[in-house]
Amino acid sequence: MTDSPVLALAKELISRQSVTPADAGCQDLMIERLKALGFEIESMVFEDTTNFWARRGTQSPLFVFAGHTDVVPAGPLSQWHTPPFEPTVIDGFLHGRGAADMKGSLACMIVAVERFIAEHPDHQGSIGFLITSDEEGPFINGTVRVVETLMARNELIDMCIVGEPSSTLAVGDVVKNGRRGSITGDLKVKGTQGHVAYPHLANNPVHKALPALAELAATQWDEGNAYFPPTSFQIPNLQAGTGASNVIPGEFDVQFNFRFSTELTDEEIKRRVHSVLDAHGLDYDVKWTLSGQPFLTDTGELLAAVVAAVEEVNHQAPALLTTGGTSDGRFIAQMGAQVVELGPVNATIHKVNECVRIADLEKLTDMYQKTLNHLLG
């Protein structure tokens, strides 16, 4: 039996071993299809990262599909039922690295746009694609750089669907209409090294820091709101000492992370953390890394169109959530764009034997096409 257009393209993309930041020719496949539809293509290569910006039309509004061609490493090959870069269909599921995150979505986007343009060759507004090979990596030379380039020439995105795997049990059951912000602090508490038998001749930074860390962990940073849970504080990494049992460490390194709502700013978080550390009399340095600001699309044409499209396909409205980690949507939201995430079920992403239900790819294609119908048809 011949594969459907979306399944065939998904297989082609999965077969390319595009472990971040490699693209391995995935974008060339997409560009070839988009050129045939009349898209203007602009390649944007920054160091080891391959990106492209594609646009069809010059009018407003500018609607964009955003996504990434890179994937995480396959992990232990012995644990895969089938080779991760040899797309395989088993019992109605397409298996392979990137099937759900997010080569399946990319295939759905392309086929949806092909079908939409076939029906609406003179559609309203403009359609764009923003594709990167640096979403699973350090996100330095990917979407953020493309956004900077577009903003510098005042080419602003109005509405954007990011194809991240937003769904939980069935495709379209969840639409992410925002994401929490993320900021990490790398704290170094300074003390004086010494022998454990002579603590009066040393200054143990671990002992000094623990009460402050306990206070930070116990703090209620905010109460959240209708769209976001309360801000969370977590400590993922601690390091002190030489490994010897008789040496008091001279330094204590602590890494902590905040996932924060729109009730807080990153500057307010910094101020409150420094206030606690200062109150405990610590000698310290903190290096801050802001991964992304929170964003929210709570109203607007895009959200209404996506919800309507999902409801038309599933006969049930999606839940609107802001849970989970960060995504490239945070960079696009900086343009003032309406941003939502809609993609496959995320149960197997970043795992061995990653897979996506083939029927879900067909449904997702319909959802994308119906969204275009509502907005630009």
UniProtKB/Swiss-Prot annotation:
The record's Gene Ontology cellular component field reads: cytosol
Where along the chain is Zn(2+) 1 bound?
A: H68, D101, E164
Q: Does the keyword Metal-binding apply?
A: yes
Manner of cofactor binding, per the entry note: Binds 2 Zn(2+) ion per subunit.
Q: Which cofactor does it need?
A: Zn(2+)
Q: Name one Pfam family in it.
A: Peptidase_M20
Q: Which residues form the active site?
A: D70, E135
Biochemical pathway: Amino-acid biosynthesis; L-lysine biosynthesis via DAP pathway; LL-2,6-diaminopimelate from (S)-tetrahydrodipicolinate (succinylase route): step 3/3
**Protein EC:** 3.5.1.18
User: Keyword annotations for this protein?
Assistant: Amino-acid biosynthesis, Cobalt, Diaminopimelate biosynthesis, Hydrolase, Lysine biosynthesis, Metal-binding, Zinc
Q: Which family does it belong to?
A: Belongs to the peptidase M20A family. DapE subfamily.
Q: What does this protein do?
A: Catalyzes the hydrolysis of N-succinyl-L,L-diaminopimelic acid (SDAP), forming succinate and LL-2,6-diaminopimelate (DAP), an intermediate involved in the bacterial biosynthesis of lysine and meso-diaminopimelic acid, an essential component of bacterial cell walls.
| Record's protein name | Succinyl-diaminopimelate desuccinylase
Q: Which organism is it from?
A: Vibrio cholerae serotype O1 (strain ATCC 39315 / El Tor Inaba N16961)
